[in-house]
């Protein structure tokens, strides 16, 4: 048993590390080949780091290393994350911050296009991919991602759009200093990234399931085993058939929906499942903690 658990732990560590290294490399290439080429200021602490670099060049004609500024900015959020979110979570996040920062300083630039609109759109897509790989490893890319995860853990909300609103402030400062055209393109970059991230990463999104079934106990056991969520049993009657039926009502994480629905269909092939996106939720809802 211990050997099995050790193998599982090693496998999980390798998986998370590989995801973070891949995400770090993609983020560094994106920053050098898209963001810098287009003169964009991305959101979050990466954007704040770029803003500080640009201000330093403007005032002193010297560009400080990306990694050094980024490490300093992430110090306090990392401490907060360590205390309130999770130790391993913070450790892997710091690995992402360190590796992506160093790679950004040493990876050469490979400009793909000079079209700023294309850079804004595809750079945003690539940025979302890099962050998603990190989130799939149960970590973050640092900065505002720490804040987003903290808000999601504490209040159970999908906070990425709120973070986007905060990033607009950073972009507003960049626009006032360096011109509004690049700031507006940067907003396109950040909006694209936020919306794609919202699609790829579903941990903090909720889905309501309404299941009409002839095997309510078996279906409920499947829901409870997969999600650790409860369900409400409602007695109903078919309007056309006039036959009595059982209706299960449950709210689960959106990332759990496919597994739940597939299991329900195996348990009761005749089950009718309605999936409804849940915008807001008040009350107790179990959320798997970050480690």
Describe the role of every protein-language-model region.
Residues 2, 32, 60, 153, ...:
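Positively charged, small/polar-rich N-terminal and surface patches that mediate targeting and assembly
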Residues 2-214:
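Core subunits and conserved enzymes of cellular information-processing
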């Amino acid at each position: 048993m211990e050997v099995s658990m050790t193998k599982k732990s090693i496998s999980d560590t390798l998986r998370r590390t590989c995801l973070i290294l891949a995400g770090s490399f993609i983020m560094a290439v994106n920053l050098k080949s898209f963001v810098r080429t287009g003169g964009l200021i991305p959101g979050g602490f990466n954007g704040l780091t770029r803003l500080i670099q640009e201000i330093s060049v403007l005032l002193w004609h010297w560009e400080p290393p990306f990694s050094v500024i980024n490490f300093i900015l992430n110090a306090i959020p990392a401490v907060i994350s360590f205390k309130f979110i999770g130790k391993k979570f913070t450790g892997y996040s710091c690995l992402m911050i360190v590796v992506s920062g160093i790679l950004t300083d040493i990876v050469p630039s490979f400009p793909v296009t000079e079209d700023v609109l294309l850079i804004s759109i595809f750079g945003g897509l690539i940025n979302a991919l890099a962050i998603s790989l990190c989130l799939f490893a149960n970590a973050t890319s640092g900065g505002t991602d720490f804040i987003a995860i903290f808000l999601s853990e504490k209040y159970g909300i999908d906070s990425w759009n709120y973070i986007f609103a905060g990033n607009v402030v950073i972009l507003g400062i960049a626009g006032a200093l360096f011109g509004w055209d690049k700031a507006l393109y940067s907003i396109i970059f950040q909006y694209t990234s936020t919306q794609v991230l919202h699609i790829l990463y579903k941990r903090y999104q909720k889905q309501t399931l309404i299941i009409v079934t002839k095997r309510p106990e078996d279906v409920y056991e499947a829901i409870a085993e997969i999600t650790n969520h409860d369900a409400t049993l409602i007695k109903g009657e078919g309007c056309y058939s006039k036959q009595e039926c059982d209706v299960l009502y449950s709210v689960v994480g959106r990332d759990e929906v496919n597994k739940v629905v597939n299991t329900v269909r195996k348990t009761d092939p005749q089950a009718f499942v309605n999936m409804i996106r849940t915008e807001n939720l008040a009350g107790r809802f179990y959320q798997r903690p970050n480690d």
